[in-house]
Amino acid sequence: MRSEKKSRKFWFIAILCLIIVLPAGWYLWSRLEKEKPTLNMNLLSPHLGQSQVFSLVVSDAKSGLRRLWVGLLKNGQEAVLHDEKFPSAGFFKGGKVHETSVKIQLAPEVLGFSDGDAILRTVISDYSWRGWWKGNITYTEKNVKIDTRPPEIEVLSRAH
């Protein structure tokens, strides 16, 4: 009789644990997803003139976008071109925005950059719980060349 009560109690606790642990484990597994946000940059040329518009398409299908940051770096000087934070749908749901498109106007001289090599940086994060709720991060750097001066033509001789 006593062993039958222990057996029933054991099975009751085991089934109760499965009912709680399996859904909780599945939910944690989905919130701790490791898929990084994707970036599609439409930069026509790595050579930047006086003014140029380029577009970015960023997406994260699973947990939603948290932040998009774009900056230009040259000789230790950095200018923020775009910084956008996306809203959360709630602690348990992730982000409201899963895909967005952004057009960025880039004018190096207005930002105080002279001609030469520079780096275009992008940082995108999502609402995954990975990294102690910091999310997955996509970090890219693209080497660009700032060239704002038009070419000059000099006449070498009048003999031709």
What residues fall within each predicted segment?
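Structural beta-strand segments of beta-rich domains
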Residues: 50-54
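Aromatic-capped interface at the extracytoplasmic side
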Residues: 24-42
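N-terminal Lys/Arg-rich, disordered targeting/topogenic segments
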Residues: 1-9
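Short, isolated positions within intrinsically disordered regulatory regions of eukaryotic proteins
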Residues: 15, 30-33, 133, 137
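Long, low-complexity serine/threonine/glycine- and acidic-rich segments characteristic of extracellular
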Residues: 6, 38-40, 45, 55-152, ...
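A cross-taxa feature marking solvent-exposed loop/turn segments within ectodomains of secreted
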Residues: 32-34, 49, 63-65
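Hydrophobic membrane-insertion alpha-helices, especially the h-region
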Residues: 12-27
